[in-house]
Amino acid sequence: MEGIDFNQIGVSFKGSGSYVPDQILTNQKISQKVDTSNEWIKSRTGISERRISSLGDNVNEMGYKAALTAIEMANWDIKTVDLIVLATSTPHDLFGSAPSIQAKLGAANAVAFDLTAACSGFLFALITTSQFLKGGSFKRAIVIGADQLSSFVDWNDRRSCILFGDGAGALAIEATNQFDNLIGFDMRTDGERGSFLNLPSKNNKDLIIDNIDFLSGAFSPIQMNGQEVYKFAVREVPIILEKLFNKTHYTSDEVDWLVLHQANQRILDSVGDRLKIPREKILSNLEKYGNTSAATIPLVIDEAIRSNRIKQNDIIATSGFGAGLSWGAALIKWG
C-alpha cells in the first residue's frame, strides 16, 4: 500500500468469477443416508443437488480459481491488484486463507485478509472493500466469497444436511474518480438471535500437565433453528431493502435484478413478492448448488454475467443474511 489518492470517490465492477467442485450430491443420494426424499427436499427448499468438496477442493483452492477467472475477465495485470478480501467461515488455515490465495495468484503487491460474517460475509466484504477503495488507499481489489460447509454438516441431521454445498465466487472492483457504482448499502447485526444459526466451538479437556486444563480446539456441526431463520429472513430482508431504496431514491421498479443469498427458494420468492419484484427478475441457482454460504451471491452474479443476463449498467439489488444473526443490503450498478 502506497499513498492516498483523495480523488477516488467511488468504485466500478470490472469482472466476476466462480468455481464449484466437480462432485455432485443429489437429493436421491442424500435420501439413501437419511429419512427424506427428492420431492420433500425440492418442495421445501428448491434444492435438487449441491457440490461437495473432495481432496484438493479446499477454500484456498476454490477461492483462488474464482479470483483468477474474475481477474481474467477484468483483463488486469495481477501485479496491479493491491487488496484481496476473502469472506469465509471455513478457512483452510484458521489463521487465514487470503494470504495463501494471494501467493497462488502471484499478487505480490496485494494486502490480503479474511473476513468472517457467515452467509452475509460476501456482502459485508464487498462493502468493506469498497470503503477502502473510496478512501484512496487502494486502487484494485478482489473480493472473494468461499466456503466448504460440507465439512461441518451433521450428515445424520436431515434438517440441515440437505441445505449446504461448497463453492466460491469473486468480483474484481476498481476505484474511480468519476462515479460510484456502489449506489448505497446498509448492514445490521442482532447477536441476541445468534443461537438460531451457529457453528460453535467444542472444547475437549486434555490432561497434558498436572493441575492445568488444556482445551483442544474443535467445532460442533452446524446447528440451526430453521423455522426461526426463515421468519427472520422473510421479515428483515424486505425491510432493509425497502429502506435502502428510500435512502438511494430508487424504486423496486428500477431494479433489473434481485440477487439474494441463496438459502431457500421460498425465501427468495417471499422477499420478491414483498418488494413487488417479478419472479423473472429474481436470480437463483440454488437448485444446482444449495446454500454455499459466502459464495452464493458472487456465484449467482458470475453465472448471470456469463449467460448474458446481467449486462452493463444493470441495477442489482442484493442482500445477504444468516448467522450472527447478520444481514445487509447493497444497490449496485454493474460496470
From Swiss-Prot:
Molecular function as annotated in GO: 3-oxoacyl-[acyl-carrier-protein] synthase activity; beta-ketoacyl-acyl-carrier-protein synthase III activity
UniProt record similarity statement: Belongs to the thiolase-like superfamily. FabH family.
Notes concerning its domains: The last Arg residue of the ACP-binding site is essential for the weak association between ACP/AcpP and FabH.
GO cellular component: cytoplasm
Record carries keyword Lipid biosynthesis: yes
Quaternary state and interactors: Homodimer.
Listed pathway(s): Lipid metabolism; fatty acid biosynthesis
Protein name: Beta-ketoacyl-[acyl-carrier-protein] synthase III
Subcellular location: Cytoplasm
Entry EC no(s): 2.3.1.180
PANTHER family in alphabetical order: 3-OXOACYL-[ACYL-CARRIER-PROTEIN] SYNTHASE (PTHR43091), BETA-KETOACYL-[ACYL-CARRIER-PROTEIN] SYNTHASE III, CHLOROPLASTIC (PTHR43091:SF1)
GO biological process, one term: fatty acid biosynthetic process
Reactions listed under catalytic activity: malonyl-[ACP] + acetyl-CoA + H(+) = 3-oxobutanoyl-[ACP] + CO2 + CoA
ACP-binding: region residues: 262-266
